[in-house]
């Protein structure tokens, strides 16, 4: 079997993986990026590179992903359809693969109206579902949608997003995404083990877990206040009251938050079908690296 990326091989081999996330800097200096993710190198199995999250401009996600690949880090390029038409997206897929970026996460992207340049007009050419199908066609059929051949075709390991906390999963929709070309899923934050277990059982009963890999989203809080903010402002995020109270009563809320993450990881990894953890958090690369290290030796 030809593996599309190191992450692909690890998941195929049954390794429980840890992925992390970074937002490219507001800088044209690549050393700024490398310094930011230094603690994650050799710790995370792969690092997501976000694509102007919150519709605020940062260094190009593709450029940042290439820099990581050139420094022996397996990147996951978050590719949004918000800013590019189909021609630009297809060109980026070929270019990314040519320079060692093989994991991609296909997303819609945040609405420009929520960013700091709200007058921006989104591309609105294709949606993320079409992007997945396009990427799959390019790697499998070795051709562009126009029919022109690609030689050699790009090596791509295609990911999508899911939100376990929003209720019972739509298994038909998820199966459709897999048929469309998705190889793995990274989820929104999950902080309730029981809900996750129920969610994964539904997926297992539908035969989904044998077809794909689920990496469950998790991350540390800066404080109880930030946990409440996530509850109120992030779609599909539900932080239980007991976790918020635990943080409020802690002498060191940041340290307590790390403990919460570590404990949830130990529970999540025992749930059937969970193949890894995707750790997120704004400017929390060092904290996330500590959580991964502790989890790997436990």
Map each language-model feature to its residues.
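Conserved, mostly hydrophobic/aromatic
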Residues: 21, 47, 96, 177, ...
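Active-site-adjacent beta->alpha loops and helix N-cap segments on the catalytic face
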Residues: 5-8, 29-31, 55-67, 85-91, ...
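Catalytic beta/alpha-barrel core
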Residues: 47-57, 79-80, 106, 183-193, ...
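Active-site mouth loops of central-metabolism enzymes
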Residues: 17-31, 75-87, 155-169, 247-259
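Active-site cofactor/substrate anionic-group-binding motifs, chiefly glycine-
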Residues: 43-83
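Active-site pocket-lining/capping segments in soluble small-molecule metabolic enzymes
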Residues: 122-151, 161-166, 206-264, 283, ...
């Amino acid at each position: 079997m030809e593996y599309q990326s190191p992450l692909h091989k690890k998941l195929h081999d049954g390794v429980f993986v840890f992925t992390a996330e970074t937002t490219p800097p507001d800088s044209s200096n690549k050393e700024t990026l490398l310094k930011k993710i230094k603690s994650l190198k050799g710790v995370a199995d792969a690092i997501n590179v976000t694509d102007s999250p919150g519709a605020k401009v940062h260094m190009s996600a593709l450029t940042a992903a290439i820099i990581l690949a050139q420094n022996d880090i397996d990147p996951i390029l978050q590719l949004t359809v918000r800013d590019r038409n189909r021609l630009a997206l297809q060109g980026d897929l070929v270019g990314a693969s040519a320079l060692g970026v093989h994991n991609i996460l296909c997303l819609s992207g945040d609405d420009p109206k929520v960013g700091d340049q709200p007058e921006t007009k989104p591309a609105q050419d294709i949606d993320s579902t079409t992007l997945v199908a396009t990427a799959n066609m390019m790697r499998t059929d070795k051709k562009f949608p126009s029919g022109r051949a690609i030689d050699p075709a790009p090596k791509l390991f295609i990911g999508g997003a899911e939100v376990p906390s929003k209720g019972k999963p739509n298994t038909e929709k998820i199966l459709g995404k897999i048929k469309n070309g998705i190889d793995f899923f990274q989820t929104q934050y999950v902080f309730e083990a029981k809900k996750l277990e129920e969610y994964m059982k539904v997926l297992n009963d539908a035969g989904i877990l044998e077809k794909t890999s689920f990496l469950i989203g998790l991350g540390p809080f800066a404080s109880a206040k930030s946990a409440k903010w996530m509850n109120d402002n992030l779609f599909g995020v539900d932080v239980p009251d007991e976790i918020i109270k635990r943080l409020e009563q802690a002498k060191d809320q940041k340290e307590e938050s790390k403990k919460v993450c570590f404990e949830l990881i130990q529970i999540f990894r025992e749930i059937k079908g969970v193949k890894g953890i995707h750790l997120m958090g704004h400017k929390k690369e060092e904290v996330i690296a500590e959580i991964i290290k502790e989890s790997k030796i436990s």
